[in-house]
Amino acid sequence: MNLNSIPAFDDNYIWVLNDEAGRCLIVDPGDAEPVLNAIAANNWQPEAIFLTHHHHDHVGGVKELVEKFPQIVVYGPQETQDKGTTQVVKDGETAFVLGHEFSVIATPGHTLGHICYFSKPYLFCGDTLFSGGCGRLFEGTASQMYQSLNKLSALPDDTLVCCAHEYTLSNMKFALSILPHDLSINDYYRKVKELRAKNQITLPVILKNERQINVFLRTEDIDLINVINEETLLQQPEERFAWLRSKKDRF
């Protein structure tokens, strides 16, 4: 299968997987126009849409795409049922698309019903995990998001993390503010800065590398613990995650 990213709005990415026959899967189409343009340019035949959550910049293009291609099956969590979803899926279930099984993983935090889709090596994680960061807590709690990130971090090392936004540079600036002397973070920041200076995409990322540079996945890391302990003593990794998320919200 081939993985494609379609830019939308200011910083969204709509992901498309296509097979050799031209059948394709579309993930979180917030805007129909760039997707329709890509379909026409590549002669794709849309088979399915995956929705991760109900926010408009992820679902806004569904109606127009389904009108154009009525055969499309739209998978999504319960919270997207009024956004065009025709097949509601939940944690532990699978979606069989393009000849592959995609596992559905519940990842509450950004929204209460947020889900991710995984079929090795592809992880479509919406607004749960970003490179160098994680989603804001609009509906869920820090505890929920911490548990959700733990689920994703436990996936295989070679997982390709397909996030829905180009937030990597700002996330790495935050990471440097927390761990300014970390070699992995500094190296990755320089790489990302160069890519963005050329207006190039920083995604997808390999999960093994992401675990090294994403402070939200390093809550049991001794260097991070020492930094947090300079300000406040927090015994549990979940508490350290909440501290980080609060810091990022104000960054």
Curated annotation (Swiss-Prot):
Lineage: superkingdom: Bacteria
Name of the gene encoding the protein in the UniProt record: gloB
InterPro entries, alphabetized: Clx_II_MBL, Glyoxalase_II_hydrolase, HAGH_C, Hydroxyacylglutathione_Hdrlase, Metallo-B-lactamas, RibonucZ/Hydroxyglut_hydro
Known pathway: Secondary metabolite metabolism; methylglyoxal degradation; (R)-lactate from methylglyoxal: step 2/2
Protein keywords: Hydrolase, Metal-binding, Zinc
Reactions it catalyzes: an S-(2-hydroxyacyl)glutathione + H2O = a 2-hydroxy carboxylate + glutathione + H(+)
Record keyword Metal-binding present: yes
The name this protein goes by in its record: Hydroxyacylglutathione hydrolase
Cofactor binding comment, as recorded: Binds 2 Zn(2+) ions per subunit.
Complexes and interactors: Monomer.
Any matching Pfam family: HAGH_C
Function description: Thiolesterase that catalyzes the hydrolysis of S-D-lactoyl-glutathione to form glutathione and D-lactic acid.
Cofactor(s) of this protein: Zn(2+)
Binding residues annotated for Zn(2+) 1, in chain numbering: H53, H55, H110, D127
EC numbers on record: 3.1.2.6
Sequence similarity: Belongs to the metallo-beta-lactamase superfamily. Glyoxalase II family.
MF terms (GO), sorted A to Z: hydroxyacylglutathione hydrolase activity; metal ion binding
Coiled coil: none
